Regions:
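PAPS-dependent sulfotransferase catalytic domain
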Residues: 100-227, 237
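Cysteine-dependent PTP/DSP-like catalytic domain, specifically the C-terminal lobe
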Residues: 80-104
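A conserved segment at the C-terminal end of the G1
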Residues: 67-78
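ATP-binding Walker
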Residues: 64
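The Walker A (P-loop) glycine that initiates the GxxxxGKT/S ATP-binding motif of P-loop NTPases
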Residues: 59-60
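Residue-level preference for short coil/turn positions at secondary-structure junctions
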Residues: 52-54, 92, 107-108, 159
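PAPS-dependent sulfotransferases, especially Golgi type II membrane carbohydrate sulfotransferases
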Residues: 1-56, 126, 188-262
């Protein structure tokens, strides 16, 4: 993936910032640690990170838990990631660059890939975009995109030299074991006490506070859970049928509670 491709992705995702003349949002202009998050839109900074093939990219389909993981990583390693920074705006030793890779053009040697069970991912995506959660057409649209994403990053890519796979469900069930993979990716032993302290800070309310730029990131209303339960009951089979259509092997990467890593 070239620096130009990364820059186009940044411009697309953070058009509002660039449109307000914040294209050089370097550290002195950012919020402090305990305030809301900030965005780096300085192309020189992004190009410098991207030009080093050994730097880590964090790749995830939308609505798979990347905000939570990035906040954990930033506090645990005390290093920010590009391009949104949550806690350490005055540091420039960036740990990763996050991308959703929706156009499936990213090819990097060093990658952490985060994924989540497809039914909940698709529901969350529909809800985020305020699309009708009962529309089979929209369900199929997002499921097909996610299926291609999973197929690329779990099965078909042949360009990574170092790839660590992390799951949202694994983080929820056993954060210590799952985050140990992340620590290992950066050749660091897991510090259990440090992780416990960091995880204790990052509640859903904290993620909500740090993502005030986008109120749709975290849903706290009680009705959300009920609507999701109905979606699961009515559309789970359809989501799996679309996901595995032409890709039957994708089912091997999921279990009822935790996921296999091939």
């Amino acid at each position: 993936m070239t620096a130009d491709m990364v820059w186009r992705d940044v411009k697309k995702r953070f058009k509002a910032f660039l449109g307000k003349g914040r294209g050089a949002a370097i550290a002195p202009q950012m919020n402090q640690v305990e305030k809301a998050s900030s965005v780096i839109t300085d192309r020189m900074i992004i190009d410098r990170f991207t030009s080093d093939a050994d730097n880590t990219f964090l790749v995830s389909f939308p609505r798979t838990g990347s905000h939570w993981l990035r906040m954990l990583m930033e506090l645990y390693f005390e290093r920010p990631s590009l391009v949104r920074i949550f806690y350490y705006p005055n540091r420039q030793d960036y740990l990763t660059l996050h991308s959703h890779d929706l156009d499936l053009k990213i090819e990097r040697r060093n990658v952490i890939y985060l994924y989540r069970t497809p039914v909940d991912t698709i529901f969350s995506q529909l809800y985020y975009h305020k699309e009708p959660v009962s529309s089979r057409q929209r369900i199929e649209h997002w499921t097909e995109l996610y299926g291609r994403h999973l197929d690329k990053w779990l099965c078909k890519e042949a360009f990574t030299g170092k790839k660590t796979i992390v799951t949202y469900e694994g983080m929820r069930q056993d954060l210590v074991a799952e985050f140990a993979r992340v620590a290992g990716h950066f050749e660091r032993p897991l510090d259990r006490r440090r992780l416990d302290a960091v995880a204790g800070k990052i509640s859903k309310d904290e993620v909500k506070r740090k993502t005030g730029h986008d109120p749709q990131v975290v849903q706290l209303e009680e009705s959300y859970v009920d609507i999701r339960s109905r979606f699961r009951a009515e559309h789970e089979r359809f989501v799996w049928d679309v996901l595995t259509r032409g890709r039957p092997y994708l089912g091997d990467y999921f279990e009822t509670e935790t996921f296999e890593r091939k």
